[in-house]
């Protein structure tokens, strides 16, 4: 005889004579497909049996991010876009970007690798919510302005969409001569004169004529 599963609340489980049994989901069912469970009952010590079918209605498709904004240090770092969903597939698309690579894959329930825009193996969302984790490498910010990128996460349904905003702090100002990291240079003007070129590399306003 099948036992009452842990996801169902069933009170009481035993009794004598006429009674009412209260049946409910322990937690709201989150799968996209109805869940049907059969539970058998019997008279103690005899062969009389009954069967109850409990039908938990499917939940709407959803995506629930753990957060809608992520702040990133100016030096760049690896971040994780995480949340929960019951969608058959998830598609990650940059709506605005500043050079971050496309999100082509992500982890489901911490172990299964899924491909953006492709049905997830085993369709875990059919029977309940799952976790997703997309790893994103944000490069160093070399400009002196904060910058933002927006990542859209879309499910199978056209209205199942969430947008994540990633904001990176402004980078440091720099001033180099002829090559990155070089702060000194010698310019030699030949005998008789002759224009020479000094290459300036910077991301900020600079001057070689300081104010007095």
Indicate where each model-derived feature is located.
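Interdomain boundary/hinge segments at the C-termini of tandem beta-sandwich modules
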Residues: 52-60, 85, 164-172
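Surface-exposed, short loops/turns at beta-strand junctions within beta-sandwich domains
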Residues: 26-34, 126-130, 138-146
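A short beta-strand micro-motif common to beta-rich folds, especially ectodomain repeats
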Residues: 32-45, 134, 145-157
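Surface-exposed binding patches on compact interaction domains or structured appendages
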Residues: 1-22, 62, 67, 87-135, ...
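Surface-exposed loop/turn motifs at beta-strand-loop junctions within extracellular Ig-like
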Residues: 27, 43-45, 140, 155-157, ...
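Beta-sheet-dominated interaction scaffolds and their linkers
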Residues: 57-86, 175-203
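Extracellular and select intracellular beta-sandwich modules with Ser/Thr-enriched
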Residues: 46-53, 147, 158-165
């Amino acid at each position: 005889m099948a036992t009452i599963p842990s996801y169902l609340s069933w009170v009481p489980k035993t009794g004598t004579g006429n009674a009412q049994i209260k049946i409910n989901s322990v937690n709201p069912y989150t799968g996209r497909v109805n869940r049907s469970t059969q539970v058998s009952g019997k008279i103690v010590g005899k062969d009389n049996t009954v069967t109850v079918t409990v039908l938990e209605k499917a939940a709407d498709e959803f995506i629930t991010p753990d957060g809608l904004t992520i702040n990133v240090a100016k030096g760049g770092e690896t971040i994780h876009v995480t949340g929960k969903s019951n969608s058959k597939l998830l598609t990650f698309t940059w709506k605005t970007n500043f050079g971050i690579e496309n999100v082509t894959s992500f982890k489901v329930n911490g172990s299964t690798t899924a491909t953006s825009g492709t049905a997830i193996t085993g369709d875990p969302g059919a029977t309940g919510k799952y976790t997703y984790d997309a790893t994103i490498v944000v490069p160093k910010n070399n400009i002196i302005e904060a910058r933002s990128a927006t990542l859209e996460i879309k499910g199978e349904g056209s209205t199942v969409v969430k947008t994540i905003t990633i904001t990176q702090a402004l980078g440091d100002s720099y001033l180099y001569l002829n090559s990155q990291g070089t702060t000194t240079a010698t310019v030699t003007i030949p005998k008789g004169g002759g224009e020479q070129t000094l290459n300036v590399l910077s991301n900020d306003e600079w001057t070689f004529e300081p104010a007095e």
